[in-house]
Amino acid sequence: MLSYWEKSEMLEHDLIVIGGGITGMFCALCYRELYPKARIAVLERGLFPSGASTKNAGFACFGSLTELMDDSFNMDQESMLNILELRVKGLALLRKTLGDKIMDYKAHGGYELFFEKQPKALDMISHFNALLQPLFKADVYRTSPSKIKAFGFDNRKVTHLIENAFEAQINTGKMIQGLRSKLNQKDIFFFSNTEVTQLDTDQKKVVTKSNGENLSFRFKKLALCNNAFVKQFFNDLEVDPW
């Protein structure tokens, strides 16, 4: 049974964010900047973020050459460049918010290996470098044959290596820990192991399950930041995360 203080101080919020990954925590931090006195809570169903925030390999990337080639087949050029720019700005915001040391950011570059004798990507380097020149003010992609052996690959199998000097690596565990620390500094609640089982936008409440107990949180505003899992609450939405 909850106490009066638990009900009044922990269950009623101006903003509730569903999803405790990168998107959810940044949403909460940005809202705090706009509304310094707001009561904000982040609800995460897992002990750790359930999405990709800590499950990727630590890539601080915006797109290899072949990824951009694939994107160009699936969308128009303007859309592709807009998405790429958002990725680049997102990485810049992450670095500005946490600092490189906190998340162990290392600018080692990004590398793509090829096994064909003459992959199509080689012919597209100059094309995409020209497209990205306004954003980076330099060539993004280049061939680096000397690094095939330097990295320990068999050059009889790996025929080409294309380097992206603007990509890097991060420690996603340290990154998430850093963001959690930011939430604490900004007086934002974070509830882990708290799965939202019911969402009622009319009554402005979410029902959660934590340690076998059902709890109702009330909100004035709600942000769904669980990306691919948003269909859990709105089945009719066509959500295709990139």
What are the residue ranges of the model-derived segments?
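Glycine-rich active-site loop/strand segments that organize a redox cofactor
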Residues: 51-85
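Central helical "cap/lid" subdomain
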Residues: 210-242
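Central beta-strand plus flanking loop segment that forms part of the substrate or channel wall
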Residues: 57-60, 65, 110-113, 237-242
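Extreme N-terminal leader/targeting segments of oxidoreductases
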Residues: 1-15, 33-34, 38-39
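Glycine-rich Rossmann-fold phosphate-binding loop(s) that bind the pyrophosphate
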Residues: 19-25, 45
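Helical element adjacent to the flavin cofactor pocket in flavoenzyme catalytic cores
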Residues: 155-219
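Flavin (FAD/FMN) cofactor-binding and adjacent substrate-gating region
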Residues: 66-72, 96-181
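Glycine-rich FAD pyrophosphate-binding loop
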Residues: 32-55
